Each structure stands twice: as structure tokens, then as C-alpha cells.
């Protein structure tokens, strides 16, 4: 076999390896998101059970969607679609006043899918108060699950991990950024740094 034929054979072999590698990667990526809705529903149900088992004494809380908070419990209230789960990682300081729906807040946050894929953030890795950046936005401008959590935070420096079902997140449609699939349970690590109400900022 001459050198020219050897060169062609080598190129064919490399092409086959590359194609096989791409195919394997695609399969792995696709399989992770197979039955995504069912997997996310199960994941939130498990977190809800854990929160109830651990209890508020251990820093776990279950809160109803802010828009349903004052409504009586009826058969139309779906526990797995109308609640968020909160794990208090650290309690902050200050008064028991809390942000309102029309207030602006200053937060550090990291948004993740159930598999810990980070789709939005203003800090990376473990939260470090000396390094994390902050963002300002109005409470009513975020998804219901995020807004519900913010309106339950009563201390500057409250540091929570918040779990929300897709119904209180981005719903049954894929996000426009293409990074959040439809029916995604979301996890947000949130640190409340302050909020703006009645014409003034409340900060630590």
C-alpha cells in the first residue's frame, strides 16, 4: 500500500472516530433530558417530602404562591404546583419587615436546573459575601416562585436555597434563551442584600 492510500485510510479512520464521538455525546445529552417533565415533577415531589420531614425547626419551609397566600385551601390547590420549598442556609439580621410586590430588591443569586446546570447568576461557586456581585430588580418583574421567596425574606442577609415547580418558574414553554427546557423545576440560591421601599433603601 502506497503512502497516498495510507493517508486516505488514516483520514477515513479519523472521520469515523469523530462521528462516533459526536453521536455518543448527542446520545448522552439527549438521554439526560428524556422524560424531562416527569423527572422534574418527581424531583420537586421529593424535595417537598424532605421539607416536611425535616420541618421548620431544621430550616425547611413550604410557602404557597404569593398570589394564593390568603386563599382558603380548596381541591383546586395543587400542593406540587402552587408551593415553593425553601431551605434556609443562613438567617440574616434586621427587622421582620419584608419586601413587597412593588418594591425593588438587591440580591446575589444563582439559578439552576435540577441537574445543577447554572442558567443565570451573578456569583459563581460557593457564595462569598466579599466577592459576590449584586443585582437590582423589582419583585413583580420575576417569576412567581422567585417573587414568593423574596416576599418571605424578613432579614437583610437571608441566604436561601429555593426550589420551585415549573408552574411557578418558566412554565410549559422553553425559555427564549434556550437554556431552560419546558417543565423545568428551578433552584435559586438567593441572598437578600437590601430592598427599596417607601422612597428609601433598607440595607444592613
What function would you assign to each model-found segment?
Residues 7-14:
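Sec-dependent signal peptide hydrophobic core
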Residues 17-21:
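C-terminal motif of bacterial Sec signal peptides marking the signal peptidase cleavage site
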Amino acid at each position: 500500500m502506497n503512502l497516498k492510500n495510507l493517508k486516505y485510510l488514516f483520514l477515513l479512520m479519523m472521520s469515523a472516530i469523530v462521528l462516533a464521538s459526536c453521536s455518543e455525546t448527542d446520545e448522552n445529552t439527549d438521554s439526560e433530558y428524556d422524560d424531562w417533565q416527569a423527572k422534574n415533577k418527581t424531583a420537586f415531589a421529593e424535595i417537598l417530602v424532605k421539607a416536611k420531614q425535616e420541618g421548620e425547626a431544621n430550616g425547611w419551609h413550604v410557602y404557597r404562591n404569593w398570589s394564593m397566600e390568603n386563599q382558603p385551601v380548596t381541591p383546586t390547590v395543587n400542593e406540587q404546583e402552587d408551593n415553593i420549598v425553601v431551605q434556609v442556609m443562613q438567617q440574616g439580621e434586621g427587622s421582620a419587615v419584608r419586601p413587597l410586590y412593588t418594591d425593588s430588591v438587591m440580591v446575589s443569586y444563582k439559578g439552576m436546573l435540577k441537574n445543577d446546570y447554572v442558567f443565570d447568576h451573578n456569583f459563581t461557586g460557593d457564595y462569598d459575601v466579599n466577592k459576590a456581585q449584586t443585582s437590582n430588580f423589582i419583585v413583580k418583574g420575576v417569576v412567581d416562585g422567585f417573587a414568593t421567596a423574596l416576599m418571605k425574606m424578613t432579614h437583610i442577609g437571608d441566604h436561601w436555597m429555593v426550589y420551585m415547580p415549573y408552574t411557578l418558574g418558566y412554565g410549559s414553554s422553553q425559555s427564549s434563551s434556550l437554556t431552560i427546557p419546558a417543565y423545568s423545576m428551578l433552584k435559586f440560591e438567593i441572598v437578600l442584600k437590601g430592598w427599596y421601599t417607601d422612597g428609601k433603601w433598607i440595607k444592613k
